[in-house]
Amino acid sequence: MELEYESKRSLYIPYAGPILLEFPLLNKGSAFSIEERNDFNLNGLLPETVESIEEQAERAWRQFQDFKNNNDKHVYLRNIQDTNETLFYRLLDNHLEEMMPIIYTPTVGAACEHFSEIYRRARGLFISYPNRANIEDMLQNATKQNVKVIVVTDGERILGLGDQGIGGMGIPIGKLSLYTACGGISPAYTLPVVLDVGTNNQQLLNDPLYMGWRHPRITGEEYDNFVNEFIQAVKSRWPNVLLQFEDFAQKNAMPLLERYRDEVCCFNDDIQGTAAVTLGTLIAASRAAGGKLCEQKVVFLGAGSAGCGIAEQIIAQMKSEGLSDEEARARVFMVDRFGLLTDRLPNLLNFQSRLVQKSDSLSGWDSANDSLSLLDVVRNAKPDIMIGVSGQPGLFSEEIVREMHKHCTRPIIMPLSNPTSRVEATPQDIMAWTDGCALVATGSPFSPVSWKDKTYPIAQCNNSYIFPGIGLGVIASGASRVTDSMLMAASRALADCSPLVNDGEGPVLPEVNDIQGVSKIIAMAVGKAAQLAGVAVVTSEDVLSKAIAANFWLPQYRNYRRTSI
């Protein structure tokens, strides 16, 4: 993707010498000019040749290619990020498609598992429960003062890998890298945070290299109070910050979102971001298949907070297309490890109970068991769309996929579980079992599939299509909250960008290299929705567009001038 880098005014910098070279946001390395080397006491600290950022990026790209292992590539890129952030993001701009799977899913999963082993340098804030009396001081200690986006995790449900303790910090770091690379939010405005509340991962507790608090996870009132102390401190330190909850366990994710969504500008990417990108993909896929979403039946494998969040967004879209609430809910089937959720099942969570099927409507189903399996649901409900958010590999079996294809000529199948090792079925298998007829979108990146002399691109239904645009839209519009209407606007804007819909061919979602343009379109839709919802000051579309452009940071070096502290 060709990018234009405009020159901007000079920055006045109080740092000099080795201190300046150790400041990742300001370090230029070999690109410091002769004048800057003289002014900032850098003579002798750098090689003679003054390089451009493109020359630096070319060297870094060649070094990157020398690594054969993705985990080593991840460590290498993180090292660049921790020494020269501008170069890091220029490198991503030049090679986003190749590097996104390295800095985030799927490679980030292994980086979280081995966080304490590969640890090189501090980034972000580690807020531990034993140190809870000093939370306000910790926020003051942050190296970035004007924070606009925080991604926070407690490390309990990292991707499909479970409890990783403070190793979960790899997720906020990676996520915020994408806020910048895809959404243009300056790295100077981002802050990753891990809440260290202990870990129940015995392997970590026994690991002599583990750097977190060696204690079983706190729960209940202790946990709730600790999280609340953190959020109140954030409100005091940065009242207008966008706070993204990331990879909290199901038992905490929804309660935290419900408690704080009307108090601070926040959202949960696992619930709302996943729902928004999935809905956008489904709207586009339904259009490509020649119909509307309200005409489809949808079955989910996985009825946790993420799956139920997606289901509620689908129902909201179906209602906007003309269905009643009851009609829309009757078209959505939730299956978990115990089978189809029905009104006869005990001990359902609150967010699950709204998504049950009425037992009376299932009386004519062909099944030998009281518990209705995914195969039973596919055979009897005859869904058009099947979505996997189970975190368990291989559960979309050949029998199930072929059964679905019997009654649906162009099934939409979305195995969304991350990382790749947890996917419910591979695109190659799905295309083989449907004779190339399925529309497939996955949560992790997969190469195009060749089937009978035709190549099918596989859309990656990745939250990175959504959350950077949401963040940019919130910042540009000055939104004080993230509303359901803003998320719905993001989904519809993403659907409008579908190459398959607009061009009649290609993937359901845009190419990764087009993601910055997509983020700007989503930001505009989100900003307008925020104004309509009354959570942002109403402006003209032109003013909002200029605000988006002004807040879109590009990785280019600025000229520096010396000033005193």
Curated annotation (Swiss-Prot):
<feature type="binding site">
    <location>
        <position position="247"/>
    </location>
    <ligand>
        <name>a divalent metal cation</name>
    </ligand>
</feature>
<feature type="binding site">
    <location>
        <position position="418"/>
    </location>
    <ligand>
        <name>NAD(+)</name>
    </ligand>
</feature>
<dbReference type="GO" id="GO:0046872">
    <property type="term" value="F:metal ion binding"/>
</dbReference>
<dbReference type="InterPro" id="IPR001891">
    <property type="entry name" value="Malic_OxRdtase"/>
</dbReference>
<dbReference type="InterPro" id="IPR015884">
    <property type="entry name" value="Malic_enzyme_CS"/>
</dbReference>
<dbReference type="GO" id="GO:0006108">
    <property type="term" value="P:malate metabolic process"/>
</dbReference>
<dbReference type="GO" id="GO:0008948">
    <property type="term" value="F:oxaloacetate decarboxylase activity"/>
</dbReference>
<dbReference type="Pfam" id="PF00390">
    <property type="entry name" value="malic"/>
</dbReference>
<feature type="active site" description="Proton acceptor">
    <location>
        <position position="175"/>
    </location>
</feature>
<dbReference type="InterPro" id="IPR036291">
    <property type="entry name" value="NAD(P)-bd_dom_sf"/>
</dbReference>
<dbReference type="InterPro" id="IPR023667">
    <property type="entry name" value="NAD_malic_enz_proteobac"/>
</dbReference>
<dbReference type="GO" id="GO:0051287">
    <property type="term" value="F:NAD binding"/>
</dbReference>
<protein>
    <recommendedName>
        <fullName>NAD-dependent malic enzyme</fullName>
        <ecNumber>1.1.1.38</ecNumber>
    </recommendedName>
</protein>
<keyword id="KW-0560">Oxidoreductase</keyword>
<feature type="binding site">
    <location>
        <position position="246"/>
    </location>
    <ligand>
        <name>a divalent metal cation</name>
    </ligand>
</feature>
<keyword id="KW-0520">NAD</keyword>
<feature type="binding site">
    <location>
        <position position="270"/>
    </location>
    <ligand>
        <name>a divalent metal cation</name>
    </ligand>
</feature>
<dbReference type="InterPro" id="IPR012301">
    <property type="entry name" value="Malic_N_dom"/>
</dbReference>
<dbReference type="InterPro" id="IPR037062">
    <property type="entry name" value="Malic_N_dom_sf"/>
</dbReference>
<keyword id="KW-0479">Metal-binding</keyword>
<feature type="active site" description="Proton donor">
    <location>
        <position position="104"/>
    </location>
</feature>
<dbReference type="InterPro" id="IPR012302">
    <property type="entry name" value="Malic_NAD-bd"/>
</dbReference>
<comment type="similarity">
    <text>Belongs to the malic enzymes family.</text>
</comment>
<comment type="subunit">
    <text>Homotetramer.</text>
</comment>
<feature type="binding site">
    <location>
        <position position="270"/>
    </location>
    <ligand>
        <name>NAD(+)</name>
    </ligand>
</feature>
<feature type="binding site">
    <location>
        <position position="157"/>
    </location>
    <ligand>
        <name>NAD(+)</name>
    </ligand>
</feature>
<feature type="site" description="Important for activity">
    <location>
        <position position="270"/>
    </location>
</feature>
<dbReference type="GO" id="GO:0004471">
    <property type="term" value="F:malate dehydrogenase (decarboxylating) (NAD+) activity"/>
</dbReference>
<dbReference type="Pfam" id="PF03949">
    <property type="entry name" value="Malic_M"/>
</dbReference>
<dbReference type="GO" id="GO:0005829">
    <property type="term" value="C:cytosol"/>
</dbReference>
<dbReference type="InterPro" id="IPR046346">
    <property type="entry name" value="Aminoacid_DH-like_N_sf"/>
</dbReference>
